[in-house]
Amino acid sequence: MIIRKKDFGIFALILALALGVTACGSKNVSNTSEGTTQYKYGKIDIPGKDGALCGAPIYIAYEKGFFAEEGFDVNLISADSETRKIGLNNGTIPIVNGDFQFFPSIEEGVKVKVVDGLHNGCIKFVVPKDSPIKTVEDFKGKKIAIDEVGGTPHQVASLWLEKAGISAKPQDGDVTFLPYSDGNLELEAAKSGEVDVAALWDPLGSIAEKSGDYRVVFDLSTDPAFAGKYCCFLYASSKVLDSEPEKISSLLSAYRKAQNWIAENPKEAVAIISDKKYSAIDDKELAEKLVVSYAYPTIKERESGGSHVAEDVKYFVTELKNIGYLKTDDPDAFANQIYQKVEVK
């Protein structure tokens, strides 16, 4: 191609603009001369293999490249609640999702802060369709299947029962919690009579209900004690937050991009989660309804002041104090201590 002199300036301008756009789009990611990719913050581990549908922002941030855009080479790992606490405390895991199960651990010295809200309710308690259990009062003396002691279903059940005057403490014997490694095993145990109730992450609870073989006796998204509140928060390692606050800010940016994308594209989000086998989804239409019910906050909602993270932290601190799960004498001060607002670009 021959470039005439009078066209050279235009050509140079177009080339400069193209290079500028490329540079702006990859400010946190670059390619080395060897052809490998370099990330601003390098490789990090994030728990994201528990199979819960509500973990959608983690899966979508990974699959849509939002983590990479913010400068992270993310390795999704499996991690129970204790592994998460240890990782957060020593800084090897910078951020995790979890409910108020971490509040007592913070009081006991685990160095972690609530930095954002992730979504609304995602847990259901189901019983066989012919079970006599219908209300919380019927739970006394019963066996409840959970995924792990100290995990979210266990903590939710504990708060719900304690508010009704039924002790969830093992030494009192009002109820018995039995851990199972898989939600399907919980359902089988409930069906066989090995346990009376299965406390399940979505989508298993809703799938069980739709089968007609089980009834839902508790829904975290609609129960008066939990409805409209974040059941799951994002927790940042205090060690990382203090030494590299911009790292946590960038991680939150990735999560928020994912939340916004899911809110605007629930059907596509479910397709990705199903195709990549992050969660067991046989009924995509049901899964889509559940994803919408989690009310992932959009960027516009955040900009208009729709966030209520601090208020929800204070609510659950107060509730946990009321049932004796927190020792603090000043719930408001403790709530302010464990929540830290992070500026996100």
Residue ranges and their predicted role:
Residues N31-D182, A189, D196-D202, D213-F218:
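Short, glycine-/small- and polar/acidic-enriched structural segments
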Residues L19-A23:
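C-terminal motif of bacterial Sec signal peptides marking the signal peptidase cleavage site
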Residues G25-K27:
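Bacterial signal peptide processing site
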Residues G48, L118-V127, Y214-L241, S293-Y294, ...:
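Periplasmic-binding protein-like
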Residues D242-Y325:
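Secondary-structure end/capping motifs
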Residues I2-F11:
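Bacterial N-terminal signal peptides that target proteins for export
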Residues V313-K345:
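Conserved C-terminal helix/tail region of periplasmic/extracytoplasmic solute-binding proteins
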Residues F100-Q101, D182-K277:
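Pocket-lining segment of extracytoplasmic ligand-binding domains
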